[in-house]
């Protein structure tokens, strides 16, 4: 058998009726009968559709042409295009000749088989649709029509099957031309109705029975085919002649093995026999057409049956399965071998060479897809495992951090209790009071404030302050206060207020540990504070400060200031300012000043008040301003007579920004100040301003007096601002009235 070059064309033409007829008839009868019958009956109807019907006719004749000789892939393309044009001319000749050799009138060189004459009878329906435009075309390229029939067969298979199966089937179709031809006939008939216009790209598949390999070539549109048809006709004829000789020995075996033995072998022999005589019988195509016309009409009516459908279905399945098995293992080798053999013969054109390269790439890509799918699966599995491991690690780390944080909180609470007990025991000793007061206060207050600012401060400060103050203040108030205030308040309070509680506590602990810190307190304070300062302050301060800042600060500051004002102010004011700067500082400063002046500042009022006032002025002034601004309407009513109603003023009131600079009272000149209330000036004159000048530390002033001074100053500023705003409003109202009057005038 000659290797047939089949091309898959996507065309839209009306061959649905013949499609039903051809699959039912045998493949041989299908190719010839459907083509012939359609051409004759549908010649007038399907002239615009002749391209697709000619493709079907060529598909039917392809088994004959395939048996007679192989065509180059480029030749197949060109031949198909040429057939489309020649079919219109020579389709009637093909219809008559297919029983002998359908395509004889067009290309005498191309073998036209009598076996196709049988096929032409069922193909009469197809020929009806194709007669219009294909009769004239088929006369010139009957051999090419056969090639196209095989190409159409491959088209249907490629469309019905996945691309992979189509490629594999194409590789073994050289061995299975008989089966493929039958399958192609069915597929051609069924596929042409659903096919796309002939202008689309076509895939040409060359089948070589001798090499048992197939090359899938991607072809250009029919324009290239038409140009190449004329040049390739002689080469195709010579190829078919050579293939017929060689295929006589080797092809029958492959055909019988690939396709059902009885239909495939009989069809192949029938194709081989007429192929040699097609050239000779080309001139007698007209007589054959006339004879076959009557036969096709009769056979077209009776040949349609269910037997062909079953046979074709089985043949297609077998052909596809065998093609898949044959090409599954070595699709690339078959393609390469065929390409090389054709290149040696000089039959491949440039377009064909490119299509061979593309076919190789497609085969390689498909072969790689299986490997890639497995590699992807392995990679995905590994990625998932790594992700799961990473997620588990992160989860475990988070869980551990949470657990550690909770454990540290509990540890700090227990450590605070242990420290309190140790502090109480240590403070009982009279000689250790100086060092113990500083150490116990710092360790106890620092840890208690950090761990549980709300509850721990109440318990810890109450117990520690009661024990420490009771025993320590009587014995060592003078020494402890002097040493503590000089050594701790200035550096520690300054750092605590300016920086953060963490730095203040580190500095305080560093100094206290130098004196005499017990081993338990050292380990507990060092580890507990370092480990839990970040976590406990965030959690505890947020919750505890909001709920119990007022009560905790009152109790803590009130008792802590008795013994060590510096430590209480460091821990309390530092944390209070960080947690709730607005409310906590207000409460802390108020209570700190009251407790400091009332209980503990008898010995060190000068130094303590200097630091306290400097630190307390900022929050106190801000709070005073807020309080005064909230009571601004009352101030308006009491001290200011407004010329306009309040409703109008409130509507037009613009925001007033009051800025109070931080200045030490020693630098504050009451006489030069314009905004100081008169009452304050009178009181200052009575008390003699020299009191401030005599002592830079303001020992004669209490915190209450400083607070009242700040409040009065702020209130005076607010009053002045309100007066100015009222004046502006009045001026604006007057100007508006004047403008209105001018408009009326």
From Swiss-Prot:
Q: What residue spans carry the region label Tethers NFATC2 to CRAC channels?
A: 728-745
Question: Some GO term, biological process aspect, for this entry: which one?
Answer: cellular response to xenobiotic stimulus
**How does the record describe its quaternary structure?**
Binding protein for dimer of the RII-beta regulatory subunit of cAMP-dependent protein kinase (PKA) and also for the protein kinase C (PKC) and the phosphatase calcineurin (PP2B). Each enzyme is inhibited when bound to the anchoring protein. Also binds the beta2-adrenergic receptor. Part of a complex containing AKAP5, ADCY5, ADCY6 and PDE4C. Interacts with ADCY8, and enhances its phosphorylation at lipid rafts. Interacts with ORAI1 (isoform alpha) (via N-terminus) upon store depletion and in response to LTC4. Does not interact with ORAI2 and ORAI3 paralogs.
Q: What's the name of the protein?
A: A-kinase anchor protein 5
Q: Which residues carry this modification: Phosphoserine?
A: 4, 22
Pinpoint the residue ranges of every sequence repeat in the record: 304-312, 320-327, 328-335, 348-355, 356-363, 364-395, 420-436, 445-452, 461-468, 469-476, 477-484, 485-492, 493-500, 501-508, 517-524, 525-532, 533-540, 541-548, 549-556, 557-564, 565-572, 573-580, 581-588, 589-596, 597-604, 605-612, 613-620, 621-628
Q: Which PROSITE patterns match?
A: AKAP_CAM_BD
Transmembrane portions of the chain: none
Q: Where is the composition biased (Basic residues)?
A: 37-50
Main location (coarse class): membrane
What Pfam families is this protein classified in?
A: WSK
- The segment annotated Disordered runs over 1-121, 162-195, 215-392, 466-560, 617-651
Q: From start to end residue, where is composition biased (Basic and acidic residues)?
A: 54-63, 90-100, 180-189, 222-231, 285-300, 535-546, 633-651
Q: Where is the lipid attached (S-palmitoyl cysteine)?
A: 36, 123
InterPro entries for this protein: AKAP5, AKAP_WSK
């Amino acid at each position: 058998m000659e290797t047939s070059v089949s091309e898959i064309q996507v065309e839209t033409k009306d061959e649905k009726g013949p499609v039903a007829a051809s699959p039912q008839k045998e493949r041989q009868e299908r190719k010839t009968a459907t083509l012939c019958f359609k051409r004759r009956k549908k010649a007038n109807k399907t002239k615009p559709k002749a391209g697709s019907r000619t493709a079907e006719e060529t598909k039917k004749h392809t088994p004959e042409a395939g048996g007679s000789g192989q065509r180059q892939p480029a030749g197949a393309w060109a031949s198909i295009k040429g057939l489309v044009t020649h079919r219109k001319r020579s389709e009637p000749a093909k219809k008559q000749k297919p029983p002998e050799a359908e395509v004889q009138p067009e290309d005498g060189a191309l073998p036209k088989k009598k076996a196709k004459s049988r096929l032409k009878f069922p193909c009469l329906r197809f020929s009806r649709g194709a007669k219009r435009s294909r009769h004239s075309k088929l006369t010139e390229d009957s051999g090419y029509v056969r090639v196209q029939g095989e190409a159409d067969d491959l088209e249907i298979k490629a469309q019905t099957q996945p691309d992979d199966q189509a490629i594999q089937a194409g590789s073994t179709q050289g061995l299975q031309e008989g089966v493929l031809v039958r399958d192609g006939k069915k597929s051609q008939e069924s596929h042409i109705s659903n096919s796309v216009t002939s202008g689309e790209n076509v895939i040409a598949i060359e089948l070589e029975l001798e090499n048992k390999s197939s090359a899938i070539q991607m072809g250009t549109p029919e324009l290239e085919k038409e140009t190449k048809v004329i040049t390739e006709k002689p080469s195709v004829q010579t190829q078919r002649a050579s293939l017929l000789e060689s295929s006589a020995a080797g092809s029958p075996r492959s055909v019988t093995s690939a396709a059902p033995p009885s239909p495939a072998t009989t069809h192949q022999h029938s194709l081989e026999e007429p192929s040699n005589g097609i050239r000779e019988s080309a001139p007698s195509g007209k007589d054959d057409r006339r004879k076959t016309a009557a036969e096709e009409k009769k056979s077209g009516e009776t040949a349609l049956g269910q037997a062909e459908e079953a046979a074709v279905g089985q043949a297609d399945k077998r052909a596809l399965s065998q093609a898949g098995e044959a090409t599954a293992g070595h699709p690339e080798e078959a393609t390469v071998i065929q390409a090389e053999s054709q290149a040696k013969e000089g039959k491949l054109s440039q377009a064909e060479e490119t299509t061979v390269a593309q076919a190789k790439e497609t085969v390689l890509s498909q072969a790689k897809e299986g490997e890639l799918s497995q590699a992807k699966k392995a990679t995905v599995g590994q990625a998932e495992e790594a992700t799961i491991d990473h997620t588990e690690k992160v989860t475990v780390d988070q869980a551990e951090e949470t657990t550690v944080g909770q454990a540290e909180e509990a540890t700090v609470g227990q450590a605070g209790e242990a420290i309190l007990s140790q502090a109480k025991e240590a403070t009982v000793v009279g000689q250790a009071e100086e060092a113990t007061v500083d150490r116990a206060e710092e360790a106890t207050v620092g840890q208690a404030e950090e761990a549980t600012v709300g509850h721990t401060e109440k318990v810890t400060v109450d117990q520690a302050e009661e024990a420490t103050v009771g025993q320590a203040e009587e014995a060592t108030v003078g020494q402890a206060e002097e040493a503590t205030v000089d050594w701790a308040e200035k550096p520690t309070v300054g750092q605590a207020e300016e920086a953060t509680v963490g730095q203040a506590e580190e500095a305080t602990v560093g100094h206290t540990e130098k004196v005499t810190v017990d081993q338990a307190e050292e380990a507990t304070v060092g580890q507990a504070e370092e480990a839990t300062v970040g976590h406990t302050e965030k959690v505890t301060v947020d919750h505890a400060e909001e709920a119990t800042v007022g009560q905790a600060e009152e109790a803590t500051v009130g008792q802590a200031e008795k013994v060590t004002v510096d430590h209480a102010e460091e821990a309390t004011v530092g944390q209070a300012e960080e947690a709730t700067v607005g409310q906590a500082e207000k409460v802390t400063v108020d209570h700190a000043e009251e407790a400091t002046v009332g209980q503990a500042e008898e010995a060190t009022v000068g130094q303590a008040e200097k630091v306290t006032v400097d630190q307390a002025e900022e929050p106190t002034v801000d709070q005073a301003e807020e309080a005064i601004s909230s009571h601004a309407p009352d101030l308006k009513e009491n001290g200011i007579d407004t010329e306009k109603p309040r409703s109008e003023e409130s509507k037009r009131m613009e925001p007033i920004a009051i800025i109070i600079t931080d200045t030490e009272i020693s630098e504050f000149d009451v006489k030069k100040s314009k905004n100081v209330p008169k009452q304050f000036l009178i009181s200052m004159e009575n008390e003699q301003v020299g009191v401030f000048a005599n002592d830079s530390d303001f020992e004669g002033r209490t915190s209450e007096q400083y607070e009242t001074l700040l409040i009065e100053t702020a209130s005076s500023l607010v009053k002045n601002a309100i007066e100015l705003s009222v004046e502006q409003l009045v001026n604006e109202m007057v100007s508006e009235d004047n403008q209105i009057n001018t408009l009326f005038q």
